[in-house]
Amino acid sequence: MDGTLWDSAAEVAESWNETVKRAGYDRKPISVKDIQSVMGKTMDVIARILFPDLEEGERQKLLAQCGEEENEYLRIHGATLYPDIRRTMEQLKKKYHLYIVSNCQSGYIEAFLDYYKLHDLIEDTECYGNNEKSKGENIALLYSCLLYTSPSPRD
């Protein structure tokens, strides 16, 4: 999603900084560049990079808080949608089934779809936060769910 449909780095950084401050974790502010450097990685890897000094349990707790508050923030404020995304998706939808697969936390895709009201264009979604599988594994998972039916035995 990030870098393809929208750019949420500034909004994610702002949201995470608020959460980190409330949680009392002492670190320099998370910059847009910090967020851009971890976009596309799975959430566990992002947490290890951004919160290296925390014990694993505390890191996961803070990561969960950041993800929840980020989702709510994005659902309310959105981010920078790339030009003509709705129109492009509508055109693609005429010929193709559209899915979103991401290495994000649960709820991130839904926050995007909610804010931009794009649910009608997407048939299914999957993400790391739902099942701890990478984007590649989740693409394979969605692909395995496809079923082709035909009245002709030759098909």
Task: Please provide the spans of the model-predicted regions.
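Metal-dependent phosphoesterase signature
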Residues: 48-84
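Conserved small/polar residues in nucleotide/adenosyl-binding loops
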Residues: 148-155
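Alpha-helical substrate-recognition element adjacent to the catalytic core
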Residues: 22-54, 83
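A short, structured active-site edge motif that brings together acidic residues
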Residues: 35, 119-133
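Substrate-recognition element of Asp-dependent hydrolases with the DxDx(T/V) motif
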Residues: 88-113, 128
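Active-site neighborhood of HAD-like aspartate-dependent phosphohydrolases
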Residues: 1-33
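Short, acidic loop-to-helix structural element flanking the phosphoryl-transfer center
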Residues: 73-100, 136
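Conserved phosphate-coupling serine/threonine residues in phosphotransfer and NTP-handling enzymes
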Residues: 4, 102-104, 152
